[in-house]
Regions:
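Solvent-exposed loop/turn segments at secondary-structure junctions
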Residues: 62-65, 111-115, 141-145, 167-168, ...
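Surface-exposed cleft-lining segments at the edges of enzyme active sites
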Residues: 78-83, 111-113, 177-186, 212-219
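Metal-dependent phosphoester-hydrolase catalytic domains
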Residues: 25-45, 233-243, 250-377
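Conserved S-adenosyl-L-methionine
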Residues: 136-143, 170-176, 354-359
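N-terminal, active-site-proximal structural segment of metallo-dependent hydrolase catalytic domains
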Residues: 22-156, 376-377
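Sec-dependent bacterial lipoprotein signal peptides
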Residues: 1-22
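Active-site beta-strand/loop signature of hydrolases that rely on acidic residues for catalysis
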Residues: 55-62, 93-120, 162, 197, ...
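Beta-strand-turn-beta hairpins that frame and shape the catalytic cleft
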Residues: 48-57, 155-169, 183, 188-211, ...
Length: 377
């Protein structure tokens, strides 16, 4: 994901406007360290398998249903609001893809719930009602009644987990806030989280965990997020089974390229290797930390949907940067996918790990799926 500098600067200009608009109700929701996530149910239930010996699991950053629109927040575009027609078409395409792959449990990132930019559609409920999933859980990472920049307005976006089976417990675990921002910017900024659920998979003590870690921090926030994610799944009972994943905004330990400025920059931006002061590097340079290459090494102690030997193969890259060639209908080339940011881990074995790069027109991230094989009793 590339940082849009206008978005970052916008928060620093909100002082006067924000103070004028403040009332008895806070503009931005601040969350407790741990609290209940929001539970959902489909409007109609579908039949489920009673005693599965395996599950197909998938993670997908769906980019709040914006597909490949050149957006002002994560690409070089200037779009801020979608029409309701655009949103529905994009969600229909996402639902069609999900219904074709048929994962049993789906980890989602960047799902909008009644946000102005996506037509105030509750995308968690919409996807439940337009797929075969029966239950869902949601944890917001950015819930603001009003963001006064660029007409953005109301925003509620976060992580979600969809399941065939009932979700018996769901909690939102707050991740640390960035410390490289002024107080006002931090107030209006994202509050990322870990969504931890317990799912009533027959004959299993089963957990699903989803997160979306920071993309643009220049301090050690990303390290804190990933360490907390690792600690969360490590604390799950060793007799239980878990899947854990999401958009970690981190490269594998074996990535040979860590500077994506030339791929990510907008036309007016310059890649000058000023990693500390040039804002283009906030989301495009993956070597800010003293040992950033090792950020995910502990997670790879677990089974991975895409194993370590294959993780850096180009067919397993999961992120693609929007570029002007996309104005040409059907454009895709060999460099379309340029890095791996999306992962699934488990404490039992995976098979048939797949990166779904053919879904290139549905988001700026490719889904990742794998079959989870339960051990024999």
């Amino acid at each position: 994901m590339k940082p849009k500098r206008s978005l970052i600067r916008t928060f620093s200009t909100l002082g006067f406007t924000g103070l004028v608009l403040l009332s008895c109700e806070p503009l931005v929701t601040e969350f407790r360290d741990i609290e209940d996530a929001i539970l959902y149910e489909s409007s109609s239930k579908t039949n489920i398998q009673n005693s599965p010996d395996s599950l197909l699991v998938m993670t997908w950053n769906v980019r709040f249903g914006a597909a490949r629109i050149p957006w002002f927040g994560d690409s070089c575009g200037d779009r801020v609001i979608m029409t309701s027609g655009e949103v529905v078409v994009h969600l229909e395409n996402i639902a069609d893809y999900i219904n074709n792959v048929q994962p049993d449990i789906l980890l989602l990132q960047e799902v909008d719930v009644e946000s102005k930019r996506s037509g105030y559609i509750d995308q968690v409920q919409w996807l439940l009602d337009n797929t075969y999933f029966n239950y869902g859980a949601y944890a917001s990472m950015w819930q603001a009644q009003f963001i006064p920049s660029d007409g953005l307005g109301r925003v509620d976006v976060g992580n979600a987990i969809l399941s065939r089976w009932i979700i018996t417990d769901a909690e939102r675990i707050q991740l640390p806030l960035r410390t490289d921002q002024d107080e006002l910017t931090q107030y209006f900024y994202l509050r990322r989280n870990i969504l931890k659920t317990k799912i009533d998979v027959p004959n299993q003590d089963f957990y699903a965990v989803c997160t979306h870690t920071t993309a643009f921090a220049t301090d050690d926030t990303k390290q804190k997020h990933i360490e907390m994610f690792y600690e969360t799944i490590s604390s799950i009972d060793t007799n239980a089974v878990f899947i854990a994943g999401g958009d970690l905004n981190a490269l594998t330990p074996w990535a040979t390229t860590r500077d994506f400025c030339e791929k990510d920059r907008c036309d007016e931006e310059v890649c000058d290797e000023d990693y500390e002061n040039n804002e283009i590097y906030q989301g495009s340079y993956f070597n800010n930390l003293p040992d950033e290459v090792s950020l995910l090494r502990d997670l790879y102690r677990y089974s991975s949907a895409i194993d370590s030997l294959s993780a850096e193969n180009t067919e397993n890259f999961t992120h693609s940067t929007w570029n002007t060639n996309e104005n040409n209908s059907g454009f895709i080339d060999s460099d379309y996918w340029d890095r791996k940011l999306d992962y699934i881990f488990s404490n039992i074995s995976f098979t048939n790990g797949t990166t779904h790069q053919e879904a290139y027109n549905l988001s700026d991230h490719a889904p990742v799926s794998a079959a989870l094989i339960f051990p024999s009793p």
